[in-house]
Amino acid sequence: MKMNHKDFFTVSNLLSVLRLFLAVPLWLLFDNYNSSATVHYWIFALCIFAAITDILDGFLARKLNQVTEAGKIIDPLADKIAMAVVVIRLAMLGELPFYYLSLIVVRDLFIFLGGIYVTNKIGKVLPSNILGKATVLIIGIVVLLTLLQIDKNSLLFNIFYYFSIIMIVLSFIAYVIRANEYLQRKKLV
């Protein structure tokens, strides 16, 4: 897989890089998480902004015909880092359990490292699939409900929380199956 600077400097990739940089103010804002509700709203607003940039970068990449190998790496990496920052900080504050954080981190780490392995073997980056995107969306909803301080015992919170756990496991299994299929196809060529 060969990339050049034109492959990197696209509108959609720059939006993904912006999302990467949002991790810093998100991390820092959590230092004052318990000081006021205003901080919750700032974190919430940055999370919504990150979600909007995620939607926009994919839309613009397709619309402007700027789908690049670099973008296939940067976009999910930005998603994983931004999500990890928020979930790590929420777990550190006791707002989300550490096993939930562990599930997300282990899944994302295996998918990332597996993606590097598959890319090296087949010579191209596997794009994200709909199940992975849906999983990030559901985890994002759990994060937003947590930031809005929705009661953890409420039906609304529990539906999204337990559904996200199911999605984390299913999307991991789907990624393993998909990677294996690509590797098997490569052996047949």
Region annotations inferred by a language model:
Residues 1-189:
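Alpha-helical transmembrane bundles and membrane-interface segments of multipass inner-membrane proteins
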